[in-house]
Amino acid sequence: MPDIPVYMVVNLSITAPDSYRIYEKGFFGFLKQYGGEFITYDDNPLTLEGEAPRAGRMIIFRFPSEQAALDWYADEEYQALSENRRAGTRLEFLTLVHGLPPRN
């Protein structure tokens, strides 16, 4: 069975912009290293039904497989960089959403 892409959905509020900026500058290199692709972010998402997302930024990016996403997240250098995100944001969630397998 081929790998199925996964999507990372993140909701956070930036509380210390300088710390978050350090994280942001290093983030894209790690994302690329693991085959990840930045999809989008939105500081004002529109909720059509249900409770609105928590305050802050919604971010979506993609990995080619669950294993690639888990390897990215477990990378020791990435985790060291993530200390800047932790110091500079209030994280509501960081969630993996599985994509659909290819259709024949």
Enumerate the predicted regions with their spans.
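C-terminal end-helix/capping segment
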Residues: 86-104
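C-terminal structural segments of small proteins and small subunits
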Residues: 70, 77-88
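A short linear hydrophobic-aromatic micro-motif
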Residues: 37, 81-82, 93-96
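Short S/T/G/P-rich N-terminal loop/turn motif that feeds into the first structured element of a domain
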Residues: 1-74, 98-104
